[in-house]
Amino acid sequence: MIHETAQIHPSAVIEGDVTIEANVSVGPFSYISGNVTIGEGTEVMSHVVIKGDTIIGKDNRIFSFAIIGEESQDKKYGGEATKVVVGDRNFIRESVQIHRGTVQDRGVTTVGNDNLLCVNVHIAHDCIVGSNIIMGNNATLAGHVTIEDYAIVSALSPVHQFCTVGAHSFIGGASVVVQDVPPFVMAQGNHCKPFGINIEGLKRRGFEKPEIHAIRRAYKALYRNGNTLEEAKEEIKTEIEAFPVLQGFLDLFEKSTRGIIR
């Protein structure tokens, strides 16, 4: 179904069970095929490919040569019915690739709301990308990666399979992330190492001074006081009631399978 207010360029190809909602525009030579839904107000520019079982929300801007919903680059993938779900108000720049999930995981790759995915960003199968995230040019996520809200992954930085990049963290340019990055932490290098707290980012997002000081103490417990990980956990737990924002540290410690950058 194509809504009467949608604007489809004559050279665009649309086939299969495609739903295009109100005020969507589709540019020249774009190809949309399969069980695809494109939400109201989304702009699809020229030469975009959207395939498979893919849901795209409202008011997104999808730039030329982006590919969304292609099969995963996982050799175990055997054509199963898996999907991509993209939220609202994302900027998906030129040549971004977002691949479908696999049945070995959740079967879906998800991107939240209000993200900026810069040129040549790659989001592999089964990734969970939250909201208000920035990924710089050529940043790449291997399969099963989680990027939490407000994180920044700078240009040319790859993230290893099954890693988590915590909320409000900052990954410097050309870094290689092979273990989990706790929330609020700045990290850089090959392999990625911690370099303090993302203070400027926290200030911009309205964190109060007492919260920032508590986050600093948690960072010191983890990295500066000579603690084991278990000792750091216990030290952070003593402040959870007063500063619930620290719960993100404990949540990451519990679910980590790759280990924490140290």
From Swiss-Prot:
Involved in the biosynthesis of lipid A, a phosphorylated glycolipid that anchors the lipopolysaccharide to the outer membrane of the cell. Keywords: Acyltransferase, Cytoplasm, Lipid A biosynthesis, Lipid biosynthesis, Lipid metabolism, Repeat, Transferase. Disulfide bonds: none annotated. GO terms for molecular function: acyl-[acyl-carrier-protein]-UDP-N-acetylglucosamine O-acyltransferase activity. Its EC number is 2.3.1.129. This is Acyl-[acyl-carrier-protein]--UDP-N-acetylglucosamine O-acyltransferase. CDD domains: LbH_UDP-GlcNAc_AT. Belongs to the transferase hexapeptide repeat family. LpxA subfamily. GO terms for cellular component: cytoplasm; membrane. One of its GO terms (biological process) is lipid A biosynthetic process. The keyword Lipid metabolism applies. It catalyses: a (3R)-hydroxyacyl-[ACP] + UDP-N-acetyl-alpha-D-glucosamine = a UDP-3-O-[(3R)-3-hydroxyacyl]-N-acetyl-alpha-D-glucosamine + holo-[ACP]. Homotrimer. It is found in: Cytoplasm. Pathway: Glycolipid biosynthesis; lipid IV(A) biosynthesis; lipid IV(A) from (3R)-3-hydroxytetradecanoyl-[acyl-carrier-protein] and UDP-N-acetyl-alpha-D-glucosamine: step 1/6. It comes from the Bacteria.
